[in-house]
Swiss-Prot record:
Top class in the EC scheme: isomerase
Keyword Hydrolase: no
Biological source species: Phaeosphaeria nodorum (strain SN15 / ATCC MYA-4574 / FGSC 10173) (Glume blotch fungus)
Cofactor stoichiometry and binding remark: Binds 1 potassium ion per subunit.
The protein's required cofactors: K(+)
Record localization: Cytoplasm; Mitochondrion
Keyword annotations: Cytoplasm, Isomerase, Metal-binding, Mitochondrion, NAD, NADP, Nucleotide-binding, Potassium
Domain YjeF N-terminal: start-end pairs: 14-220
Catalytic activity: (6R)-NADHX = (6S)-NADHX; (6R)-NADPHX = (6S)-NADPHX
Regions crossing the membrane: none
Entry protein name: NAD(P)H-hydrate epimerase
């Protein structure tokens, strides 16, 4: 685990960075989602080696966070895991349709029964809401987040534990008030919520140019070997 402090990236700055990556950075949304999902899959591999259980339940929301989950599930399948997808509010966007088709071609199952699937898994990926989340948790996700909050199954949250405010952390009431998953992977850079997080913290962002990192005052940690993720201490987030 690295010990250097890392700066955090607000929701507004994260959105601006994404737009810049897709303009002056010349990345496509497909590339960014592929890199994010690959990072998520590697974090799962570090947290849940195959000999600890192969069944992975990936809970996907309707936006980019859910897309990251779909990509991660595809990589996990090729690593030898047995992913199951919970994707109740599917986007009609062509990118997400292709990501679903790729999983269907691999015979990866989709389920509408989250409580049932949760009883038959070894690990959960929370890819429901990401850095753009705000407001109330809408159906069908309140009960899903409550189930994640109470389960003893290990959970990896993608960019943010679902229902959390990117700036302020867990909500004061309602679904997710007590949601503290064992692990979190921050994508590109940690968000301010990390100051409230108490579990293991990974960073996936091994694609930023030094110039863009400097522009957004971000630190690029040292990644080992072929790794797309690095574990960082949660107390490293600076505001």
């Amino acid at each position: 685990m690295i010990k250097i402090p890392l700066n955090t990236l607000s929701a507004k700055s994260a959105a601006a960075l994404d737009q810049e990556l897709m303009s002056s950075g010349a990345f496509s949304i497909d590339q960014l989602m592929e890199l994010a999902g690959l990072s998520v899959s590697q974090a799962v591999f570090k947290l849940q080696p195959l000999n600890k259980g192969k069944r992975i339940l990936v809970a996907c929301g309707p936006g980019n966070n859910g897309g990251d989950g779909l990509v991660a599930a595809r990589h996990l399948f090729h690593y030898g895991y047995q992913p199951t997808i919970y994707y109740p509010k599917q986007s009609k966007n062509e990118l997400y349709q292709r990501l679903r088709k790729q999983l269907e071609d691999l015979k990866v199952p989709f389920t509408e029964d989250f409580p049932g699937a949760l009883k038959q898994t070894d690990h959960v990926v929370d890819a429901i809401f990401g850095f753009s989340f705000s407001g109330e948790v809408r159906e069908p996700f309140p009960k899903v987040i409550e189930a994640l909050e109470s389960t003893s199954i290990p959970v990896l949250a993608v960019d943010a534990p679902s229902s959390w405010s990117i700036e302020d952390g867990p909500p004061e009431s309602g679904p997710g008030k007590g949601f503290m998953p064992p692990a979190l992977i921050s994508l590109t850079a940690p968000k301010p919520l990390v100051k409230h997080f108490k579990g293991r913290h990974f960073l996936g962002g091994r694609f930023l140019s030094p110039e863009m990192a400097e522009q957004y005052n971000l630190d690029i940690p040292k990644y080992e070997g072929l790794d797309q993720v690095v574990e960082v201490p949660v107390e490293s987030g600076k505001l």
